[in-house]
Amino acid sequence: MICVDHLCYHYKGGRPILRDVSFELEDGRFLAVLGNNGVGKSTLLKCMNRILTADSGHCRIDGEDLLTLSHREIAKRVAFVAQHVPDTQMTVHDMVMLGRRPYMTWGVTEHDHHVVHEAMRYLNLEDMRGRFLNQLSGGERQKVMLARALAQEPTLLLLDEPTSNL
């Protein structure tokens, strides 16, 4: 279960962008946050994976406050696909493999390879595995980032305008 409890956030020198946001989301459920530009949708998602730290309030995953978890532990539980996709000279396979990084302590395992293969297969990226991201269209890069997020096997998947380039 995901619990956002009285979350507040403001940017330095700016007006409050999140004011007393609260909701609970049961496992297996979906939540869409809709609104105009600049109302805090992306900010909420960034607070939900501790890219940003809220001024007050709490985000909990299965009862554990994100503030008590290490960034590595958060990365195991929360995958975030940003609306802006990097344009990098990394292969599709290597970018998706980055999704497994929080689990890697002694190198890449057979399970890591299997999870990455399945994420790429699910999004029809197998034929692109050796191509570089900077050679792909915006939509193709967005699919790669989604595959990377799925390869994390997260408890919580946060998608910030995941189809803006598709």
What are these regions (language model features)?
Residues 34-36:
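The feature captures the beta-strand-to-loop junction immediately N-terminal to the Walker
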Residues 151-155:
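A short, proline-enriched helix->beta-strand linker immediately N-terminal to the Walker B motif
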Residues 49:
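Helix-to-loop junction immediately C-terminal to a conserved catalytic motif
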Residues 132-136, 140:
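Conserved ABC ATPase signature
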Residues 57-65, 74:
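Conserved ABC transporter NBD signature motif
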Residues 157-161:
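Catalytic Walker B motif of ABC-type/P-loop ATPase nucleotide-binding domains
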Residues 1-4, 8-20, 27-32, 68-70:
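A short, flexible loop at the N-terminus of ABC-type nucleotide-binding domains that lies
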Residues 146:
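Hydrophobic anchor residue at the start of the ABC signature
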